[in-house]
């Protein structure tokens, strides 16, 4: 998960947010030099901040040069509490909870306008039914708050770009069509691929020019990408699930 989100929070945002260090040329005598000029940081929020993936977002965003974490949102039962109170003993990361978020008051993710007013865009990692996730993410987009989603709900929405930046960065060109559908000027939803695809597609893509048309792929998954442990998922203790139905078709699509 750490490797997945590290790629997600570096390369993916390069294409979606514009790299915040932009090259500028200036002439010094007869020589032309290229320098890096520091651009603004983006104020960002995490929706689903108390869950495992939300916690990982928080650790990755700590002291980040591009992003300033200013809003944490979760379910109504966490809203109004400090982040430290809301998470309690459920902090699952190996590193300590960042001091910068401990006293931040958690917002209700359903209060879209309140969250959207504080940020340039949000990262979304909520644990809800897919139709509820779709509705929530589009609500943020319609509030003119771009959504970068770790969820799978919009991966097959035709006008939502699913980006593996080394392969299909140009897919963000579909965003104007999505904005037209949603009636937005700035808001949109963009998603990452599933963890399996983003691990092997970058390696396979360059081989296409050599005529390779079919590949047999076997993946070996961790216990859970959602934070389940042996205690909360006893079926996996001393066990292996040899086949997970629907995964092949999902990846082929």
Specify the residue positions occupied by each region the protein language model found.
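Basic polycationic patches enriched in arginine
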Residues: 7, 11, 25, 31-33, ...
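Cysteine-centered motifs
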Residues: 3-6, 17
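N-terminal Rossmann-like NAD(P) cofactor-binding subdomain of oxidoreductases
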Residues: 33-248
């Amino acid at each position: 998960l750490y490797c997945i989100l590290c790629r997600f929070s570096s390369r993916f945002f390069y294409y979606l947010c514009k790299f915040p260090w932009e090259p500028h040329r200036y002439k010094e005598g007869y020589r032309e030099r290229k320098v890096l000029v520091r651009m603004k940081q983006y104020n960002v929020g995490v929706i689903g901040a108390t869950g495992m993936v939300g916690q990982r977002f928080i650790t990755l965003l700590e002291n980040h040069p591009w992003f300033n974490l200013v809003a944490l949102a979760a379910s109504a039962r966490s809203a109004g509490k400090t982040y430290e109170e809301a998470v309690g003993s459920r902090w699952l990361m190996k590193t300590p909870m960042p001091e910068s978020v401990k006293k931040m008051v958690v917002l209700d993710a359903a209060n879209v306008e309140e969250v959207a007013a504080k940020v340039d865009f949000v990262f979304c990692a909520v644990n809800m039914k897919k139709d509820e996730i779709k509705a929530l993410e589009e609500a943020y987009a319609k509030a003119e708050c771009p959504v970068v989603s770790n969820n799978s709900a919009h991966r097959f929405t035709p006008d939502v770009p699913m980006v593996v930046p080394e392969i299909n960065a140009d897919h963000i060109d579909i965003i104007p069509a999505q904005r037209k559908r949603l009636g937005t000027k700035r808001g949109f939803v963009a998603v990452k691929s599933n963890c399996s695809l983003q691990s092997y597609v970058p390696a396979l893509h360059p081989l296409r020019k050599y005529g390779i048309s079919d590949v047999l792929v076997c993946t070996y998954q961790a216990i859970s990408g959602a934070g389940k442990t042996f205690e909360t998922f006893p079926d996996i203790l001393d066990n292996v699930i040899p086949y997970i139905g629907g995964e092949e078709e999902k990846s082929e699509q």
